[in-house]
Amino acid sequence: MLDFVPNHSAYDSPWMSINKDYYIRERPDVEHNSTFFFENGVAFGGKMWTDVAQLNYFNPETRQLMQEQMLKIASLSDGMRCDVAFMVSNSFFELSWKNELQYYNYTTPLTDFWEVSIAEVKRQYPNTIFLAEVYGSYVIDMITQGFDYVYDRDLLTHLTNGNVDEVRAYLYSTAEYEQYMARFLENHDENRAASFFKNRTTITNAAALIAYTVPGMRFLFQDFQFGYKFKLEVHLRRSYDEPKDQEAVKFYEKYLPIFTSDVFKYGEFEMVEIKGDDAFTFLAWKWKYEMEKRVVVVNFDENQRECFVVIKDAGEGKEEVEMQEMLSGVKITRKSKEVQEEGLFVIVRGYSGMIFTYN
């Protein structure tokens, strides 16, 4: 997957001399505003990036030019991550550049750029995967305009807040489009995951147990498995030297093969019932794919807690169900009816979890 930056070009791009109308331009009837515009009248990218030039997505020629760039990328890669994808949608773009667009007589296109361009790329390269960097209310827009996956920054926010009810409510409220979500704890724009969780590896690992076992893309960043604390700066292409966090390394040695298995990719996902006085600190769900079954239980709380996890398909047609906790390797046998009705009793350390395989 390659990075496609649609919103702007370099200030010294050859496009600038070919056709300035590719770009948003300052109105000549107002005093020059150096906060948002270069001396030649071309706008900074997004009014914030002062070293790049803002492309005009209400100009059909610009749209055609950028669609050609997408086709070139699609010919070279399996997909593209589209930088600040929401910023070129009609609604956002008009809100950002309304005065300039009106002055130069640009009107709102009948369709969004992504809707047309993604369809054309997929016509020529059907297997191309599109990932949108998007936030807030524009998430649904990017899905409806054709993206295969969209950033899920909100899950990271809720996990950072540390409120289990908040995380649970979010997962239920987004269930309709959960398969489109790209789940991540860090990326090139964000700080390292540990910084969101008080630099405590146990909390970071517990967040990973949640983020990477719910439906959607598992969007992993370079060296995530080493538990580094210092951000890998894009412009420097390096970070401070630091030792690997051995607790994180040992955790991912066991966890990585688990959450990348087929059952978590292609299986059927379902939230499960949790019982007991401590149920409010737990999150739990199960997956089923062909003959494989998994149930994930996470205690996202400081203290050791206990609960009953109701697994209605445990030991179907059998008196007993055989289970193995995959992170520890511990095997147990329980009465099927007990697990189906009362629930599997578990005691889980603070900020920890269990992943069971069962028949």
Where do the model's predicted regions map?
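Active-site and adjacent substrate-binding regions of carbohydrate-active enzymes
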Residues: 1-359
